[in-house]
C-alpha cells in the first residue's frame, strides 16, 4: 500500500448535526445546507455526483450540476443518448451525492428518475449561452470521435447552417430525481461522524441516526 496515500488525513470537527439542528423535512434540511454552501461562495456548490446502473448491472458515476430542486425532486440536464441516459431508460433508479469539504458535509439522495416535460427542457435550453446550446446540439455524447478538431468542425458547420436560432434537439433535455431516501453526513471528531437518514414511509418522512 502507498504510504504517502495512507498519510493523507484531515481531522473533522467544525460543525455538528444534533437533534435540535435537524429539520423534520429533508428538503428543508437540504435547502439549509445548500444555501450555506452558496453563501460561502464554495466553487460549484451545485456540483453533484450522479450514479446510475446499466441493464447488465454495471454502475457508473459522473459529476453534473444541479439546476433546480423542490419537493418534486432534483433536476439536471443531459443528452438522452449518453451512457447515463441509456442507463436511466432501462433502470430508472439512481443516486446523487453532494460533497462540500469546506463544510465537512455530504448529502446522499436516492430515488426514481423521470424525464422533465418538454416545456421545462425548452425553458432551460433557451436560458443557456448560445455556445452551450450549440454544443448540446452537435455533440454525439458518449460516442467515439476521431479527434477534437472534428468536434469543432461539427460546431462550426452547425453555426453556418443554423446561425443563432434553432430549437432544442429531441435527444437533449432534463431529468428529475424524486427522492425516497436522504442521508446527511457531518464530519466530527475522531471519525464519530453524524449521520441522519430520512426515509419515505407511507408518504411521510421519518428520520433516524446511523452509526458512523
Where are these regions (language model features)?
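Binding-site signature for planar aromatic cofactors or substrates
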Residues: 1-212
